[in-house]
Design a protein with these regions (language model features):
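Glycine-rich cofactor phosphate-binding loops and adjacent beta1-alpha1 units
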Residues: 188, 192-236
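Mid-domain Rossmann-like dinucleotide-binding core that forms the NAD(H)/NADP(H) cofactor-binding site
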Residues: 87, 122-199
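A glycine-/small-residue-rich N-terminal strand-loop-strand element
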Residues: 52, 73-97
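A structural motif shared across PLP-dependent enzymes of the aminotransferase-like
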Residues: 96-109
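Residue-level recognition of short, solvent-exposed, well-ordered loop/turn junctions
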Residues: 31, 87-88, 108, 143, ...
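N-terminal glycine-rich beta->alpha transition that marks the start or flank
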Residues: 2-3, 24-73
Length: 236
């Protein structure tokens, strides 16, 4: 019998640390159509975890004790009757609410997405990579040769959008909040990095990119959003 350890929300409140505890129990074997996965890495989303503890996630009601974590990557260790794929030993990614912050998870076989290898970089591409691709290509209709501005450009979503926009052959303006992030963004090809602690994004855009931003991807909102709108190119 396999022993499982999982992080559980045992009460609601503002602090994830105070509202959660580690619980240990045995892990059941997979039933028909299920797979048992040994999680190796879990994606961490601090904002989502905080909202879970406050029961403020719109699509999920939290009633303690509640399971935690969403995306995870690991190895299929056992399969139930009727499972054709994935097979034991296969590397898989899952995106199931409450099944990531634990050693072992049981899930329907169709929820386990085969991937080439178990690596944190692969896991990061599932939520952030897909979101970035949809935002840029499907919503923003990204092409090439455009001026693209990305806020929170070194964050989980922003860093992927920045690299995709650079790879597509665009002039990329990356906004971030410290020197280390600025250096990293420059290293991956951002053409103009704005550290908002040293420079005013509004002033930079007014002097260098007035009415010339073709596509702006904003993860901050508020006054920043207004500044970006003010400097969009015609039809931007």
């Amino acid at each position: 019998m396999r022993e499982n350890e999982r992080i559980v929300i045992h009460r609601l409140g503002e602090s994830f640390r105070d509202c959660t505890q580690i619980r240990r129990d045995s892990c059941a074997e997979p039933g028909p159509g299920e797979v048992l996965i040994r999680n190796h890495f879990a994606g961490v989303n601090g904002v989502y975890d905080q909202m879970m503890c406050l029961d403020k996630v719109e699509h999920t009601r939290v009633t303690p004790p509640a399971e935690t974590g969403v995306e995870a990557i690991g190895i299929v260790e056992a399969v139930g009757d009727g499972v054709v794929s994935p097979n034991p030993g296969q590397s898989v990614v899952t995106v199931n609410v409450g099944q990531a912050y634990r050693y072992w998870q049981l899930c329907p076989a169709e929820d386990a997405i085969p991937v080439p290898q178990v690596a944190p970089e692969v896991l990061a591409l599932i939520p952030s990579g897909v979101s970035a691709l949809v935002a840029l290509e499907q919503v923003g209709e990204l092409t090439t040769g455009e001026t693209v501005l990305i806020t929170a450009a070194a964050g989980g979503l922003g860093n992927v959008m920045t690299q995709l926009a650079v790879a597509a052959g665009n002039h990329v303006i990356a906004v971030c909040g410290n020197a280390d992030k600025a250096a990293w963004l420059a290293s991956v090809g951002a053409d103009r990095v704005i550290n908002y602690r040293n420079e005013s994004p509004g002033a930079v855009l007014a002097s260098e990119y007035a009415d010339s931003i073709d596509l702006a991807m904003d993860s901050v909102g508020g006054d920043v959003f207004d500044v970006l709108v003010d400097h969009l190119a015609p039809r931007g």
